[in-house]
Amino acid sequence: MSYKRLNSDLIDLIELRNELHAMAFNDPQYDDLEDDLHDYEDTFNRRYQGIIAPILIRIHKKLAPEIPHLIPTAYVANHYEYLAETDTYETDGTSGVVLENGAGNNFRLTFVPNPTRLLLTSSKDMQVVWSENQPDDETK
């Protein structure tokens, strides 16, 4: 598995989502960009479903076994902030897939690039539950 390619494709997807997020609905280019984004999401899901699904299954099984895993793009936030000085992306933690545990706590699971990783966020905490730097580790 080329995590370098996954990271690059994730960044391309994020850039498309950011571009659409910044565009007004009445912009003449909005519909075309939205179509391009959906096409890219379909390609991303086809390309990475078989690779990412086992990771997501492990995470869901450990953190929220009653909630089935979704397609990879469901875990990509709608908007990211790019920080050029560190070449990283941040999200505000309000996007991604919601996981609820039995104690009534809500968490969100979100993909972030550079390096590719899955973040588990709550209103109080954020932790990396999977990273390309430690791909075979058990879910934390």
Language-model region placement:
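Short, charge/polar-rich alpha-helical segments
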Residues: 1-10
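Non-transmembrane amphipathic alpha-helical segments
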Residues: 9-23, 40, 47
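N-terminal processing/targeting junctions
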Residues: 22, 76-81, 117-119
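Short, charged, amphipathic alpha-helical segments
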Residues: 30-39
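Long, charge-patterned amphipathic interaction tracts in eukaryotic proteins
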Residues: 38-108
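Charged, polyampholytic interaction/assembly segments that form long, compositionally biased interfaces
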Residues: 88-140
